[in-house]
């Protein structure tokens, strides 16, 4: 009898440990809490690409293909005045030079001459070389004042899904990779219209950017490797849906006055008090580590382009000292610590290089 009780006790403890490991693993994959994925039909629509957009049978995921005929993409069915936009994404593998996979918000189809935009753009590479990516922000058509930063990743984004997210509120913008905030833009009064203020839609696309994406256009898309497949799943859209608040004939109207009377205060309050709107001390440390190890260009340190940094730039002396006046790294485009980190990873593959350790 005693042996039976002891056996049950051991089994119960083992089950608790297994459950804890599963919960921790889930958090590492999802990265952020309070994310409510939608079905494709709930809030998304086919943008372009004919048969190159393939939805899963459960309508929870979608594949975007690029072949020699066309790329593909989807768009949110509504426009949002501020929001949290998130997806688990897996990128194509092997040779991907010239390819761009983009997850972004924009209103360029509506406000053609003064559009707003928030970008996460993945830039393909030669086989054996890693994907790179950039974030960017435009407000009120300020495309001549790009605010891009470029980075490497601490994992292979073609091997498994990782969550990429954009938070846009009235006061700040945060770009996330899993549970790590990689960039925060705090709104400053001096930014004026350069801070995105008009309703935007969510977009996801894959397309041929051979003219610039890899080594400045030196290497283009090789369609002998096609089709190139990017996968999106567990897509989340949280925000103030302004399309539902407009009369039918005014949907997608390019008159900003049609949107000004829509009250988004409750939605904004929800966004600004949610977990993904607050950077904890551990997450701030993870963001600092990420930027130290993986950021290789920042417009804030590009003094040739901007003799005076744009008003939202926070100049970190230790960070600035690693960059040339072109905004690029001094050390031949490579962080000196990265080589040591690679050696450590080879010794201990289970230890993440960057983690918020929530």
Positions of predicted regions on the chain:
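GH16 jelly-roll
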Residues: 2-358
């Amino acid at each position: 009898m005693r042996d039976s009780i002891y056996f049950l006790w051991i089994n119960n403890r083992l089950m608790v440990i297994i459950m804890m490991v599963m919960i921790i693993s889930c958090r590492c994959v999802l990265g952020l809490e309070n994310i409510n994925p939608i079905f494709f039909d709930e809030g998304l629509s086919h943008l372009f690409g004919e048969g190159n957009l393939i939805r899963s049978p459960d309508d929870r995921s979608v594949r975007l293909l690029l072949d020699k005929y066309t790329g593909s993409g989807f768009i949110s069915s509504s426009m949002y005045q501020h929001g949290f936009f998130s997806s688990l994404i897996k990128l194509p593998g092997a040779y991907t030079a010239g390819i761009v996979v983009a997850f972004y918000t924009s209103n360029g189809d509506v406000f053609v001459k003064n559009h707003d935009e928030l970008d996460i753009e993945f830039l393909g590479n030669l086989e054996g070389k890693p994907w790179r990516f950039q974030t960017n922000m435009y407000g009120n058509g300020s495309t001549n004042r790009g605010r891009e930063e470029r980075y490497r990743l601490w994992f292979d984004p073609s091997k498994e899904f990782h969550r990429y997210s954009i938070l846009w509120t009235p006061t700040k913008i945060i770009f996330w990779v899993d549970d790590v905030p990689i960039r925060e833009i705090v709104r400053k009064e001096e930014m004026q219209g350069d801070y995105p203020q008009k309703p935007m839609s969510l977009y996801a696309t894959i397309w041929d950017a051979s003219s610039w994406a890899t080594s400045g256009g030196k290497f283009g898309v090789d369609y002998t490797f096609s089709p190139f497949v990017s996968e999106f799943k567990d897509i989340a859209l949280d925000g103030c849906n302004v399309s539902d608040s407009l009369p039918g004939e005014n949907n997608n109207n390019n008159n900003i006055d049609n949107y000004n009377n829509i009250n988004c205060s409750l939605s904004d309050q929800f966004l600004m008090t949610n977990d993904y709107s607050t950077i904890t001390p551990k997450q701030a440390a993870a963001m600092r580590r990420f930027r130290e190890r993986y950021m290789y260009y920042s417009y804030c340190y590009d003094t040739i382009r901007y003799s005076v940094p744009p008003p939202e730039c926070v100049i970190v002396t230790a960070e600035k000292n690693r960059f040339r006046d072109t905004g690029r790294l001094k050390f031949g485009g490579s962080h000196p610590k990265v080589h040591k980190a690679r050696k450590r990873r080879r010794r201990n593959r289970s230890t993440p290089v960057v983690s918020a350790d929530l």
